[in-house]
């Protein structure tokens, strides 16, 4: 596999872009773990020329929706892009960006303190686990505890250890339930939700939550997962394989375990496809999140030839090429430099018509009216979706 | 005719969730429930109704071990949940 440049190409802002489109392009340019001097110069130039007419409300809204507000905030502030060389403001309300980044860093520290306790407890109980997504990605992709908002702690586990996990978490004050309306209690999930999740969503368990009593953290959330693959996908994969391959890593200051790089890639591809095409996520507007494409791109950039080769092998073993093809195809639309042609060619999209379909995992296939790039930055893209998810309960991990 | 291993109330509740089973057709213990109209949402509703009927709460470990593919599997689940023997509340 050819060595890929460490630095993505400089974004090409179109001179005739509308204020809304300019906001979208700026978001793509700034939502990167690293900005080169060339990118900074280009952004500063564009903001100096067109910043006054840019739809900044849309920019902030989209940055929030796509989970990248702390990151773009950091980049705007750190590279002094919010003001010209003469000190003239180029982006209004600079404080929004600094607060988003600094506040996120404090918030992530609070999560780290709590989740470290959880990892210790799970480890002390002798339960085999691997952390998915979240903090391992923060460490690998960003190397900055403030750059990426973290929500829950996703743990990949064997199903037969769930009872022990429940005991360990209960001892720490967690319960499977939802926050009460006044935010002061955790109320158990209703029986229908419990039965549905336990009989139909056997790749996950209902989340365990705990009140944080902090304004910047609604809840501490632990998401147990016993398979990377949706039940409806038909993929049968022994979670033990993934746990056998887990690697040691210090996470939240604790000796812990994360999935190996290849499994992280598979997880990122599969999860991206699931979120983009499942009604559960579409309904809450979490189907297309720039953050997820960015992180897959970064994982791909960091993958060497050995990882790529093993990735191809495991995708074949787990028969998840369809999800991988979807994920690589769409990630390449946003980050063409991150997806090597040799890798993408190995996972061709079997039927291009499926690229704009959703609902397959729900057992009801529908088609989007607009294409991916149009939908990505359209906050109202789900307004014409009439199909409804039949999954009751929390709108968290599925 | 062989006596059903379950009480009439169980059969009545199960039949109510099998729209593709003729009313006068026997409820065979090995009948494929999905083929006779029991979908995933209806399964959840059925389990809730059976819990209420029999006055039991199915433990999680039993839920995870059960396939719900035929009447006998569902009955055995409820019987196990009830301990010595399930009976209408």
Regions found by a protein language model. Give the residues of each.
Chain A
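Conserved NTP-donor binding/palm subdomain of two-metal-ion nucleotidyltransferases/polymerases, i.e.
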Residues: 2-151, 157-398
